[in-house]
Amino acid sequence: MKSRFKVIPGSIVAPKGFLASGVFCDIKRLGTGKGSEKGRKRDLALIVSEVPATVAGMFTTNQVCAPPVKLCLQRVKNGTAQAIVINSGNANACTGKQGWKDALAMTALLARQLHMPEEHVLAGSTGRIGVTLPMDNVQAGILDALTVLDDALECADHAVEAIMTSDTRPKQVAVEFELGGKTVRMGGICKGAGMIQPGMSATGRRPLPVPAKAPSASARNRGRAPGHATMLCFITTDAAIEAKALRAALQEAVANSFNRITVDGDMSTNDTVLVLANGLAGNSRSTIHGSRFSNPLSITSASIWPK
């Protein structure tokens, strides 16, 4: 049977109207792994939609929640976002009031440069816990990333490299499918290798969403407090979809994918999945329900992880 989903190049810049970049700003320790250049590693990424997008998110249920997660929890309630700034090498977690100020400063700078409301900019961080962000580096990195922001394939590659920490390879995918008589594209990037056990919900609180299919024995513990390091995922799509339907679809997709993963059983303070849907595919919003859209989201989420 022929699949309705076609894997295509482009990752997060495959959908219409999305730009990305990944740069070096020296947050990470010097290294020679993927994304390194003369001993440096990319450690700051931008994902930007050319138009305001519908947004949905799923977040860690760890009682210790990092400032970037708290910021996203507040802002996704509005249902609209247009840009995401992500840094690696520092989780900005357990950093007190300064951590909150730094998360706000990251998004405020990007919003000013892109001439959009601060509420439309989201943030993600991963890396060392308990250390404040080197904001001079972060701010310089944001300005640098804006100069190379583009829809070129290498820009998506640079973005996924910039969110990696202990990952041994980049995790990214893009798919194309028909929806409402229009061709729709969806792309995703993800990071997370050792010490992960995502247990995410839309509110950052338990209980977790229930998988549509019967859970495995290990998944039956979803009501317990998992012993959860950081899993980040960012998905872009040019589908037009209402915020309520996107939230429902993402909850189902995460329940059937990321919330079933465990490596060493460690949950992060920063686990986050964000989806931006900018509507540029031109399909009718009224034809999409959460249950219909969860299938491509589930496939994209599951396909990000390399075999």
Where in the sequence are the language-model features?
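N-terminal amphipathic/basic leader segments beginning at the initiator methionine
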Residues: 1-60
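Short, well-ordered amphipathic alpha-helical segments that serve as non-catalytic structural scaffolds
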Residues: 64-75, 100-114, 247-260, 298-307
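Glycine-rich oxoanion-binding loops at beta->alpha junctions
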Residues: 54-77, 167-175
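Glycine-rich, mobile lid/loop segments that gate access to catalytic sites or pores
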Residues: 104-105, 109-204, 224-255
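A glycine- and small/hydrophobic-rich beta-loop-beta segment
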Residues: 273-307
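Short, surface-exposed loop/turn segments at secondary-structure boundaries that line and modulate
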Residues: 84, 88-97, 119-140, 262-284
